[in-house]
């Protein structure tokens, strides 16, 4: 049985997810909570295998909560389930160790399958989010790209040549 904790500030969402996931033979919803602080308290009592985590919640948001959970309980998998797909949320959630980032438009069948895959060690990212992630990492790679330069030859370049090199480097 895969033990799941649902964290969402909207009661209707918590109840709906609990009903939907409760129909799965291999998934047990061990509890529902409304914010990140309640997640921490719930995890201290009984460790879930997977946490379905909303991003925007009162008291403590899903990104900060994900960071704390992964630092203290690295074996617990976190799937961010949210309506928000802005770059900062996506980047930070994945940076702090979320195993999945899914948008709430996902079907019940897809969500159950995502929980199973994440439980078994696979990362799950919504297709639209995957495109954003690739673009983000591409931009990061370009910014952090460093090359080795022969200092002796580089000292001979004129200012105009440096200008051309800089422009070529920027693409």
Which stretches of residues belong to each language-model region?
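Acidic catalytic/metal-coordinating carboxylates
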Residues: 35-38, 61-64
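Active-site residues of response regulator receiver
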Residues: 8, 54, 82
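Short, flexible helix-to-coil linker/hinge segments that flank and couple to helix-turn-helix
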Residues: 89-95, 105-154, 163
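Receiver (REC) domain active-site loop signature in two-component systems and cognate sites
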Residues: 57
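Active-site beta3 strand of CheY-like receiver
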Residues: 46-52
């Amino acid at each position: 049985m895969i033990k799941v904790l649902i964290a969402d500030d909207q009661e209707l969402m918590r109840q709906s997810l609990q009903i939907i996931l409760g129909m799965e033979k291999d998934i047990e919803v061990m509890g529902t909570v409304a914010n990140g602080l309640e997640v921490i308290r719930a995890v201290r009592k009984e460790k879930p295998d997977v946490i379905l985590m909303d991003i925007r919640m009162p008291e403590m948001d899903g990104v900060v909560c994900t960071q704390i959970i992964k630092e203290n309980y690295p074996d617990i998998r976190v799937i961010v389930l949210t309506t928000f797909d802005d770059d900062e949320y996506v980047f930070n959630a994945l940076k702090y160790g979320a195993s999945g980032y899914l948008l709430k438009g996902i079907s019940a069948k897809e969500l159950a399958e995502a929980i199973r895959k994440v439980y078994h060690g696979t990362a799950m990212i919504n297709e639209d989010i995957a495109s954003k992630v690739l673009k983000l990492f591409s931009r990061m790679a370009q910014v952090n790209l460093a090359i080795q330069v022969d200092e002796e030859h580089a000292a001979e370049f004129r200012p105009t040549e440096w200008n051309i090199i800089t422009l070529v480097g920027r693409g």
